[in-house]
């Protein structure tokens, strides 16, 4: 069975990497999980603390769009970590691919 996998890469403003990771680990990822979003992996890049990745998995691209639209429209997100996260991001890149479930599970940390 295939999963739709979204890979987000962020270039963060200089000096915000540790703060960003704390917000992700303590607030954003638990919020994602409460909304039923499968966060496969996330963290700072090994080469630069101000580079970050977030990998999320979904049943299909349609499911991804529905779930993320609902999540980003929620008061939990808008009144929660949204501003702290957006303020740290200088640029972002999004890639969406289909992977076998076993490959997705291999990315989990």
Region locations from a protein language model:
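An amphipathic, aromatic/His-enriched active-site/gating alpha helix that lines ligand/cofactor pockets
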Residues: 22-40, 59-95
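Short beta-strand segments and strand-loop junctions that repeat across beta-rich extracellular domains
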Residues: 10-11, 71
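Short, surface-exposed ligand-recognition loops at beta-strand->loop->(often short) alpha-helix junctions
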Residues: 11-23
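Short beta-strand micro-motifs enriched in acidic
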Residues: 44-45
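Long, low-complexity, Ser/Thr/Gly/Pro-rich intrinsically disordered segments that act as flexible linkers
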Residues: 12, 49, 87-109
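Short, structured motif recognition centered on aromatic/hydrophobic residues
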Residues: 4-9, 20, 31-32, 51-56
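Residues that cap or initiate secondary-structure elements
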Residues: 14-16, 60-62, 100
């Amino acid at each position: 069975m295939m999963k739709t996998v979204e890979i987000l890469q962020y270039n963060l403003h200089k000096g915000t990497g540790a703060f960003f990771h704390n917000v992700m680990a303590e607030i954003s990822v638990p919020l994602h999980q409460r909304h039923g979003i499968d966060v496969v992996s996330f963290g700072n890049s090994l080469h630069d603390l101000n580079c970050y990745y977030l990998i999320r998995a979904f049943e299909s691209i349609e499911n991804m769009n529905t779930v993320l639209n609902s999540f980003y429209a929620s008061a939990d997100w808008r009144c929660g970590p949204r501003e702290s996260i957006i303020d740290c991001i200088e640029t972002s890149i999004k890639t969406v691919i289909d992977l076998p479930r076993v490959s997705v599970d291999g990315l989990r940390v």
